[in-house]
């Protein structure tokens, strides 16, 4: 067990040396499952079955999982729900599943590549007032970005994005090295043996939002755009022929003919759009990793810290080697 001895949430809420239990609710569930026989929940849908590794499941999360299992595009995928499951946008946080030839950009979400950069520090004591001042002065949070792009911009070329015309490249470049908002944080943890760990939790900032929303909209247009075009063409033709009394009946018939039982949040991309999304998602994941490393660089340099070991964990991404999606799990 670790304890947080200093931390900064975004917006900032810095406290020291206050003891805060890490992931208290998650630990409670894990302890509960260890103390008794593990109970898994199985949710059967029209096209798939999800296995939930938890004895407890809120109703909103259950409904979202059921909806995913009822979609034909997920037939054949392996769906596993982690113990930290809770309702999210489009699908539950805690979703892990295999991907085939279709992907819902909204399931990865707008914070593509969100994760944590962890650095074991050689130091055993930290001047927290100095650290607090450094973070507030040098690391933008909320909607703010850097005035001058961080040097790590040299390690990525965002002009390679296939949706580059949908992205504010200048803002993206100045976002590397910024914390963002929501549940993102910077903290120092102490292990039971006294070692200190710097942890930075952040993602792809507004770039991830731009990429995700572009492909989600493209997916919706691909699925429903043709139907909208046919409806408008029929209306124009009926007006030209003076058959105004038939317009409403024709609209109703065409909408019924092209009706799709797919929630808008689960609109998927396939084919060329699938390839383009995977390409841009991987580049955005690299951006998120560099963003965290840039913040670590600012802190390590400003504080004069020495790193013993560094590692990254990601919890909002698709492993493109194994084609496995992880949504906050």
Tell me what each language-model feature is:
Residues 17-31:
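Short, positively charged and aromatic/hydrophobic N-terminal segments
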Residues 1-5, 13:
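Targeting/processing segments of secretory and organellar proteins
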Residues 96-97:
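Glycine-rich phosphate/pyrophosphate-binding loop regions near the starts of catalytic domains
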């Amino acid at each position: 067990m670790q304890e947080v001895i200093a931390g900064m949430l975004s917006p900032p809420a810095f406290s020291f040396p206050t003891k805060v239990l890490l992931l208290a609710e998650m630990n409670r569930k894990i302890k509960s499952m260890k103390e008794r026989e593990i109970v898994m929940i199985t949710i059967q849908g029209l096209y798939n079955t999800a296995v939930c590794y938890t004895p407890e499941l809120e109703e909103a999360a259950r409904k979202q999982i059921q909806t995913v299992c009822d979609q034909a595009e997920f037939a054949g995928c392996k769906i596993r729900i982690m113990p930290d499951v809770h309702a999210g946008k489009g699908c539950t946080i805690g979703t892990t599943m295999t991907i085939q030839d279709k992907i819902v950009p909204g399931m990865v979400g707008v914070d593509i590549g969100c994760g944590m950069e962890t650095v074991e520090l050689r130091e055993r004591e930290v001047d927290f007032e100095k650290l607090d001042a450094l973070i507030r002065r040098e690391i933008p949070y909320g909607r703010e970005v850097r005035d001058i792009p961080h040097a790590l911009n040299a390690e990525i070329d965002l002009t390679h994005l296939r949706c580059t015309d949908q992205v504010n490249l200048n803002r993206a470049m100045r976002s590397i090295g910024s914390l963002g908002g929501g549940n993102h944080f910077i903290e120092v943890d102490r292990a039971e043996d006294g070692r200190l760990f710097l942890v930075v939790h952040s993602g792809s900032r507004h770039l991830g939002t731009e990429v995700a929303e572009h492909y989600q909209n493209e997916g919706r247009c691909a699925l429903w755009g043709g139907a909208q075009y046919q409806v408008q063409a029929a209306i124009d033709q009926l007006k030209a022929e003076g058959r105004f009394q038939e317009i409403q009946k024709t609209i109703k018939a065409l909408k019924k003919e092209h009706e799709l039982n797919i929630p808008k949040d689960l609109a998927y991309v396939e084919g060329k759009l699938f390839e383009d999304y995977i390409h841009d998602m991987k580049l955005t994941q690299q951006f998120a990793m560099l963003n965290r490393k840039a913040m670590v660089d600012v802190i390590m340099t400003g504080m004069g810290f020495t790193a013993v070991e560094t590692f990254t964990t990601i919890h909002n991404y698709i492993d493109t080697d194994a084609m496995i999606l992880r949504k906050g799990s």
